[in-house]
Design a protein with these regions (language model features):
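Intrinsically disordered, low-complexity regions enriched in glycine and serine
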Residues: 225-248, 275-276
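Long, compositionally biased intrinsically disordered regions
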Residues: 3-5, 247-294
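Intrinsically disordered, low-complexity regulatory segments enriched
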Residues: 61, 77, 177, 206, ...
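N-terminal leader regions that mediate targeting or early regulatory function
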Residues: 1-126, 130-133
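Alpha-helical bundle/repeat cores within regulatory domains of eukaryotic proteins
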Residues: 125-226, 249-269
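Acidic-enriched, low-complexity/disordered segments with a strong bias for Aspartate over Glutamate
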Residues: 10, 26, 45, 50-51, ...
Length: 294
């Protein structure tokens, strides 16, 4: 199942606020803050954020092909593949969290990407996410087969947590659990996303109770929940975190039909090996085609 140990360490480091990293950050850096204040243009697209929101919403082909905008719309405290964008700093994140205009723009960035994936923010207060009312199938098909978007989703979730909208993380992941795994519940339409969902998306949810509940739900849907609530047993360890790896190694799992059909393709397209080495390696390998984010 890939570098799940590295993924777990990456997620924990994110949730803990990147211990020790502040000393290495430039206290004068303000690139992300200025972009979200609509005062700096992103590069290489040379657009202000308000113009990007207005002109790119619903432009699926442009969002799929573009490789430089995602690091600007969703800055995180990790380097990305766009050398013209800068990692978020703790000083920037702290300042931006206090600005209502930043949160409003971040919400628009989030809605832009949800729409691209065939989804919509049904309730901005509760964070409830649903399928886009028209044409969700095209977005789902692209997401199910365009694996660089799995890296984008990891980045979006992390950014929501950094800039004051952590409350939106769990509701989106809850929706994704259904859409990826729960065929009996009317979902199961995004099976290729299963590995990323379990090992990269849910583990960065900052709300501990919500995160562990989601991991238990995933365990039940994938493995029947036979492992109990312990901390990570055999090969299931890293990505399951507090949700209970159940002591069942990847090679021993009996996958439900929705996953059996895609186990080989999922291995082939997996594009997240943890923020340590493998995720960067995948980015470097696929940059010329599509991989635009770590």
């Amino acid at each position: 199942m890939g570098n799940t140990g590295g993924a777990a360490r990456d997620a924990e480091r994110y949730r803990l606020g990147y211990p020790g990293q502040e000393a290495e950050e430039d206290p004068r850096a303000a690139q992300n803050e200025e972009f979200y204040a609509n005062q700096r243009r992103c590069l290489p697209d040379r657009m202000l954020i308000d113009d990007l929101h207005a002109q790119w919403f619903g432009q699926s082909a442009r969002l799929e092909r573009g490789h430089g905008f995602i690091q600007w719309l969703f800055p995180i405290r990790e380097p990305g593949m766009n050398y013209q964008a800068a990692p978020l700093t703790l000083r920037e994140a702290t300042a931006m969290r206090e600005q209502p205009a930043v949160r409003q723009r971040l919400l628009k960035s989030y809605e832009l990407m949800l729409d691209f994936y065939g989804m919509r923010l049904a309730d901005a207060e509760t964070g409830e996410v649903g399928r886009r009312e028209a044409g969700h199938a095209a977005g789902y098909d692209n997401l199910n087969h365009s694996s660089h978007n799995y890296l984008r989703i990891t980045r979006v979730l992390k950014c929501l947590g950094e800039l004051g909208l952590a409350r939106l993380q769990a509701p989106w992941c809850r929706f994704l659990v259904r859409e990826v795994l729960d065929r009996e519940g009317g979902g199961g339409l995004l099976p290729n996303c299963a590995d990323s969902l379990e090992n990269y998306w849910v583990p960065v949810v900052k709300d501990e109770a919500a995160r562990e509940g989601l991991l238990r739900q995933i365990d039940i849907l994938i493995r029947g929940g036979g492992g109990g609530g312990g901390g990570g047993g055999g090969g299931g360890g890293g990505g399951g975190g507090g949700g209970g790896g159940g002591g069942v190694g990847a090679s021993e799992r009996t996958l439900p039909p929705v996953l059996q059909a895609v186990e080989k393709p999922r291995d082939a397209v997996r594009s997240e090996g943890g923020a340590a080495g493998a995720e960067q390696d995948d980015d470097a390998k696929d940059w010329s085609d599509a991989a635009d984010d770590k």
